[in-house]
Regions:
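Nucleotide-activated donor-dependent transferases that construct or modify glycoconjugates
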Residues: 1-14
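Short beta-strand segments
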Residues: 4-7, 42, 62-67, 91-92, ...
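Short, glycine/serine-rich, charged loops/turns that create anion-binding
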Residues: 10-12, 96, 251-252
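Conserved strand-to-helix beginnings and helix N-cap segments that scaffold or border functional pockets
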Residues: 16, 73-74, 100-103, 222, ...
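Glycine-rich beta-alpha loop elements in corrinoid/cobalamin-binding modules
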Residues: 29-31, 37-167
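Radical SAM [4Fe-4S] cluster-binding motif and immediate context
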Residues: 173-256
Length: 256
């Protein structure tokens, strides 16, 4: 099974380009569970994504969804859906309302997306891939995915919103393999992308301007200090072209 994950960014000049750490976590988690059953390919460039799509058609495509890449994801997603309407396409990220009315409105407007994964998506995306893996190849379709309920995800099926926000929160973040230590970020580090590293997730505060300020994400969890040190050392040795490390924590310094 071939899966494309895209965290797209404009690349007409090399300024403020960051590693796709988010889809890296999702890939590392599913790859650890499924092994060689799935071939994962990660993309930042829309041109590289579409070139790869023309050369080899995937069984599933996933997009990250942020304010800065919504247009690029729309362009690529609509192109693929027009070319192959049965292609399953999923999306995740904070650029969406979290109430059911907002989710339904988003899915009806963004109709190239079959299933939206809410909050941290490692477990939900693994469940989707595992579901499709169990289907005959001719049943790995958009319609089949949309009719299947995956915890933490929503779809429009038979003109009705289905799904739930039953987010599976990991109790131990170290259960999610590192996208750096597994080598998934190596191509991007080699190209000079700034590495985004997390030391913890979650925030107990409810700031209205922040995507972390919701109850589903208010428990603070941390990666082990040993893992963080290993990641920082790995990045320092591998990032020859970038001069900075970006911390992606919701609230850096909140934990001792």
């Amino acid at each position: 099974m071939l899966v494309y994950f895209a965290d797209l960014a404009h690349d007409y000049f090399k300024v403020n380009q960051y590693t796709p750490t988010g889809i890296g976590y999702i890939t590392a988690y599913s790859k650890n569970k499924l092994g060689d059953k799935v071939d994962f390919r990660l993309f930042k460039s829309v041109n590289k994504l579409l070139d790869a799509y023309e050369n080899e058609k995937p069984d599933l495509v996933g997009f990250s969804n942020y304010t800065w890449n919504a247009g690029l994801s729309k362009f690529a997603g609509e192109f693929m859906k027009k070319d192959n309407p049965s292609l399953p396409i999923i999306m995740g990220g904070p650029n969406i309302r979290i109430d059911k009315e907002g989710i339904e409105e988003f899915l009806r407007i963004t109709n190239y997306v079959d299933t939206y994964c809410m909050f941290a998506g490692e477990h939900s995306v693994y469940e989707i891939i595992n579901f499709l893996l169990k289907q005959p190849k001719n049943m790995r379709t958009s319609a089949n995915l949309k009719s299947h309920v995956t915890n933490g995800c929503y779809s429009i099926s038979n003109d009705q919103l289905i799904g739930n926000s039953n987010y599976t929160r990991p109790e131990d973040l170290d259960e999610i393999p590192s996208p750096f230590l597994t080598g998934l970020m190596d191509p991007f580090l080699k190209d000079g992308y700034y590495p985004i590293v997390e030391t913890n997730r979650g925030c107990p505060f409810s700031c209205t301007f922040c995507v972390w300020g919701i109850s589903a994400l208010n428990k603070v969890l941390k990666f082990s200090m040993q893992r963080v040190k290993e990641e920082l050392n790995y990045v320092a040795k591998s990032s020859f072209k970038s001069s900075a490390i970006v911390l992606g924590d919701a609230n850096f310094g909140i934990l001792p």
